[in-house]
């Protein structure tokens, strides 16, 4: 006897992805990429009337063009007159957050059909700028009202952090990487080989993904060795270890209730049930975190997502962990219980992701990293993966800032054993966790916590995290050639040093 389903259960019924890579294809502006991804999602669903009947149109913040109301621009293109128009602020976590909350809205009866989409035309915009041209894309009237905003508008860094160079993700995630290497007790060379192997495995996955931007598999050495095509960005990250935002891509998902899917004529084999979603934010400023290579918020959100779905790490077959940089993937894998937090004779580390790949797309270097919208691509690909492996469970994570903001989603072609979608936001628990104070006035003895070397056009500098004798964090820098060489060839974490009044760090 078939299980009777709650007609309010939220399901993903359609996904769409678009990529414009070849020069012969006319480029599209972001709003049209979003709309076309939604059209493809409706076709994918096999149903009708989903776009025109959408209750909510939600868009992921786009950076390659500015619309006064991107959700309205998309709604007009797909013929929708929704009750709710909303757009996220900047944050790679927010596509995941919107999906998690959309599922909760549908389960609660607040909506029947919600469409979520995002798109970036960064490569086209960059090429136009390089040629001294402006994009002839649509501009909304000044009379158009701004949409509802989803997400946290706080600046990711404070004035002190900004002054000390703790600004760009591509400079901060390497600090996480070095701190993680030290915690695991890995050698410098051995660690480089391991993250190269992880990313090489990601490139293999991308080679089979028809929606991936770069589909040529690369070896570990091709990824980690600097070259003219693969410059060093910030030690230990080369260009091929960083997210690739120079893409023209769009992705979309359509989420409905079971009842709405049946009314629209969506075949049962297109349904993917959302089982659980959880979201949480770590201490906002990196300066205040207890360490640089963990994420209590992701750990807590993951715990809740597992519990609400009545599943554990061993029950998950398919993963797509947020992959802006290798440290994000590794921290995610540790916090979700997929690999050990310590390097016990190399167990679970050298083969990270070998038995169960940690990506279904190939990751943000190879599949593409369209700024805030990667997670929509990851979820769309996960839906296809689950449809092709009926009954299996998939897990997607979303990450914004500097492993700051997180969302976790669990889904399957089978309905949730709990009989309903469940959602959690354990923010109060995370906020109550210990925090570290920062002392930017400290001079004297410090212990190095992490260090990277930032490679700029004609110069290099080291960005350094240290701890004072009282345990406070103090940021520092160095342009000394010997210090920078040591940072890239030896283990400086735990080394004693001196911090001057201007933040310069010198080894004892």
PLM regions with names:
Residues 404:
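Gly/Pro-rich active-site capping loops and adjacent beta-alpha segments
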Residues 96-104:
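Conserved phosphate-binding catalytic cores of ATP/NTP-utilizing and phosphoryl-transfer enzymes
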Residues 1-87, 104-111, 115-253, 258-260, ...:
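Conserved "HGTGT" condensation-loop signature of ketosynthase/thiolase-family condensing enzymes
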Residues 380-387:
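Oxidoreductase and adenylate-handling cofactor-binding alpha/beta cores
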């Amino acid at each position: 006897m078939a299980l009777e389903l709650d007609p309010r259960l939220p399901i993903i019924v359609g996904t769409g992805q678009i990529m414009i890579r070849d020069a012969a294809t006319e480029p599209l502006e972001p709003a049209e990429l979003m709309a076309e991804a939604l059209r493809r999602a409706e076709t994918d669903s096999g149903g009708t009337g989903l776009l025109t009947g959408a209750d909510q149109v939600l868009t992921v913040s786009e950076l390659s063009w500015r619309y006064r109301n991107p959700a309205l621009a998309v709604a007009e293109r797909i013929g929708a007159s929704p009750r709710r128009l909303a757009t996220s602020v900047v944050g790679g976590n927010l596509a995941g957050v919107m999906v998690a909350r959309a599922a909760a809205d549908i389960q609660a009866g607040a909506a029947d059909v919600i469409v979520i989409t995002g798109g970036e035309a960064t490569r086209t915009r960059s090429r136009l700028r390089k040629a001294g041209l402006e994009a002839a894309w649509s501009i909304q009237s000044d009379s158009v009202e701004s949409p509802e905003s989803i997400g946290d508008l706080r600046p990711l860094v404070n004035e002190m952090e900004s002054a000390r160079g703790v600004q760009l993700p591509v400079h901060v995630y390497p600090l996480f990487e070095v701190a993680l290497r030290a915690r695991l007790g890995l050698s410098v060379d051995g660690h480089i080989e391991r993250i190269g192997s992880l990313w090489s495995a990601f490139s293999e996955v991308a080679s089979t993904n028809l929606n991936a931007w770069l589909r040529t598999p690369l070896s570990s050495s091709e990824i980690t060795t600097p070259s003219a095509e693969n410059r060093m960005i910030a030690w230990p990250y080369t260009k091929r270890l960083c997210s690739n935002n120079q893409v023209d891509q769009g992705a979309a998902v359509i989420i409905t209730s079971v009842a709405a899917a049946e009314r629209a004529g969506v075949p049962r084999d297109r349904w993917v049930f959302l089982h659980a979603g959880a979201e949480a934010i770590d201490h906002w400023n990196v300066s205040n975190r207890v360490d640089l290579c963990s994420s209590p918020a992701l750990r807590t959100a993951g715990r809740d997502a597992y519990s609400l779905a009545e599943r554990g790490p061993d029950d998950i077959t398919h993963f797509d962990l947020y992959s802006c940089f290798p440290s994000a993937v590794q921290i995610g894998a540790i916090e979700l219980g997929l690999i050990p937090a310590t390097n016990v004779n190399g167990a679970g580390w050298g083969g990270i992701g070998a038995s169960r790949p940690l990506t279904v797309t190939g990751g943000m270097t190879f599949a593409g990293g369209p700024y805030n919208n990667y997670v929509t691509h990851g979820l769309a690909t996960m839906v296809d993966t689950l449809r092709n492996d009926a009954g299996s469970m998939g897990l997607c994570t979303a990450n914004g800032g500097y492993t700051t903001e997180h969302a976790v989603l669990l889904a399957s072609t089978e309905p949730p054993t709990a009989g309903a979608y469940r959602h959690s936001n354990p923010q109060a628990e995370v906020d109550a966790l210990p925090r570290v104070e920062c002392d930017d006035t400290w001079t004297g003895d410090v212990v190095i916590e992490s260090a990277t070397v930032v490679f700029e056009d004609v110069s290099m500098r080291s960005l350094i995290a240290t701890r004072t004798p009282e345990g406070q964090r103090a940021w520092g820098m160095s342009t000394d050639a010997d210090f920078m060489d040591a940072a890239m060839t030896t283990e400086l974490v735990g080394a004693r040093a001196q911090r001057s009044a201007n933040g310069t760090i010198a080894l004892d």
